[in-house]
Amino acid sequence: MQVIETLAQGLKRELKVVIPADEMQARMNERLVEVKDRVRINGFRPGKVPVAHLKKVYGKSIMADLVNEIVREKPTEILTSRGEKSATQPEIAMTEDEAEADKILNAQADFEFTVAYEIIPPIELKDASGIKVTREVVDVSEDEVNEQIQRIAESARTYESKKGKAANGDRVTVDYLGKVDGEAFDGGKDEDAELVLGSNRFIPGFEEQLVGVKAGDEKTITVTFPADYPAANLAGKEATFDITVKDVAAAAPIEINDELATKLGLESVDKLKEIVRGQIESQFGSITRQKVKRQLLDQLDELYQFDTPERLVDAEFENIWRQINTDLQQAGKTFADEDTTEEEARAEYRKLAERRVRLGLVLSEIGEKAGVQVSDDEMQRSLFEQLRQFPGQEKEILEYFRNTPGAAASLRAPLFEEKVVDHLLTEVSVTDKKVSKEELTADDEGDEKPAKKTASKKKAAAKAEAGEGEEAAAPKKKAPAKKKAADESAE
């Protein structure tokens, strides 16, 4: 076998691989001898079929199998012998000329193919001891815990039907039918809808007109959908709602005590406070972690500058760009609304894609040299976490991860990355700084904010993660039930 390098430009490589016809013939003969005792051909005793006859009957199919094996296995062997790693799956090209292909299958011509790929650039690890990060720490106050428990108590409060008029804070149960220009519209009908007056869960003007109603009342109200309402056919439109009031209920007083804790499945209010404090600390800890990680990645990005494989950057950019356009569409906005143009946004997100790929390669190299491993138990826990996120789809999710190439890698990648970050935090200078909740949660996008206002851009930029073009490969969640048009939700 002969390997000839035909291209070495930047990170791009192309090799020409030539396997002489006599070598292919020898391989085929070996394979024919292996199958000789197993084949059954009429007119011949088992094991007595002449090799020449076997070649005539099975030669081309065996040669085709050999060709497939070679193009599947040899590129990896060749790259290993050259001390190279391909950034993506190498592209293999063979002759498309049928006559030439037939000669190869009959061992009458050399088998030639090309291997095109981009190498992962060699990365010389640098001393990280000069990196300094600040870890913001928030002390969870008693007031913070009590406020959260108050919210929990409000969500768990009970209501008792009452006679008389509905007031703010009461829960009304209604049937309603919405119309625009006298015609009912999709999503404008509901039965036994429960609404706490004053919660601002429905569109503006809806709840206010129900203050004072009583059980059994029938009423028609007029409202105007907000100009930025997600459903374009309703945005800015005046609508009427025919309402039947089925029940008015007053809220029971909120009492934060052991009885509330018991209702929530806990033994005491002290245990409730302990759990709530832990949840708040965990939430703050996650924010702290992300901000520390951002500082670390920013400084690593300054330390390492090298060319990135174009195909990896292309794949990462497509992931980002797809998300940006989805977010803009859902927000009903355009690039012009965000004081930018599509061309400018593309350029900015291309830079972000390059950064992600570069950091991914750096973290991968650091992790490999440090011996960072993701255990089977960690992978199993990550898979279970995925299953919890998609209730009712557990079987589908399992099948996805079993049968989809790269799916397991999508679970491993973030686990590996976080473990590498943990390793780096033992080598860099970390200074704790006590801050307020407001300071911790203040928007901090740093240099990764590619444009001025776009919420979708915040989502993309905030990740700055070290993927290698393999962003989440998990199946999409099923779409939630369609929201009623009147219900804006308090989310």
UniProtKB/Swiss-Prot annotation:
Q: What does this protein do?
A: Involved in protein export. Acts as a chaperone by maintaining the newly synthesized protein in an open conformation. Functions as a peptidyl-prolyl cis-trans isomerase.
Transmembrane segments annotated in the record for this chain: none
Q: Write down the superkingdom of origin.
A: Bacteria
**One GO MF term, please?**
peptidyl-prolyl cis-trans isomerase activity
EC top class, as a word: isomerase
Gene label: tig
Annotated NCBIfam families: tig
Q: Which reaction does it catalyse?
A: [protein]-peptidylproline (omega=180) = [protein]-peptidylproline (omega=0)
Pfam families xref list: FKBP_C, Trigger_C, Trigger_N
What family is it from?
Belongs to the FKBP-type PPIase family. Tig subfamily.
Keywords, sorted A to Z:
Cell cycle, Cell division, Chaperone, Cytoplasm, Isomerase, Rotamase
One GO term (biological process): protein transport
Domain note for this entry? Consists of 3 domains; the N-terminus binds the ribosome, the middle domain has PPIase activity, while the C-terminus has intrinsic chaperone activity on its own.
The species this protein was found in: Rhizobium meliloti (strain 1021)
Q: Subcellular location, in the record's words? A: Cytoplasm
* All residue ranges annotated as the PPIase FKBP-type domain in the record: 169-254
**PANTHER family (alphabetical):** TRIGGER FACTOR CHAPERONE AND PEPTIDYL-PROLYL CIS/TRANS ISOMERASE, TRIGGER FACTOR-LIKE PROTEIN TIG, CHLOROPLASTIC
Q: Specify where it is mainly localized.
A: cytoplasm
Q: Coiled coil located at which positions?
A: none
Return the EC number: 5.2.1.8
Q: Where is this region: Disordered?
A: 434-491
Q: Per its record, how is this protein called by name?
A: Trigger factor
